Amino acid sequence: MGRLFYKPENAWVGDLIPYYENGTYYGFYLHDPRIRDKEYAEETTWHLIETKDFVNLDYKGESIARGGIHDANKNAYTGSVIKCEKDGLYHVFYTAYNEDFKLRGKTIQSVMQATGKNLENLETVKDFLFVSDGKQYEEFDWRDPFVFWNDEDQCYYMLLASRVMNRGDLRGGCIALCK
């Protein structure tokens, strides 16, 4: 049996974001180009590979571009993918990070959205920026959104890795629920 290991040319694979539909597995991953020595997770975008059998992989390229140096999504980090039955569009919610966006001396994280009719060409929704209000949860840890449909409430839920306000750097980590 052969060994399967995917590595893009001139980059590293960050987090893997899986999605499955109609017999095809979609493996979004954080494409880390490591442009500068000893600099990790800078200029990160979402790239896509597809497979039906986990032996033959089809690289599709960049699916979500990052923003510019003045945008919240200078780096596009981990998130999740859903397909909305109402509009037929794919919706991706992902962590947006720019080390230059700071509050009280700490970098903040936010959530952005990308949509598309197919998974290969997703466009960031420029006016969607979801941030913590800084009352219950800290603004610094607001990341890794996971979105799913809740049948009982008939609405989408979003889970986020977060931190309860004023618990210190080593305490207070939690999962935030947004409806």
Model-derived segments and spans:
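Beta-rich carbohydrate-recognition and catalytic domains
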Residues: 1-144, 148-179
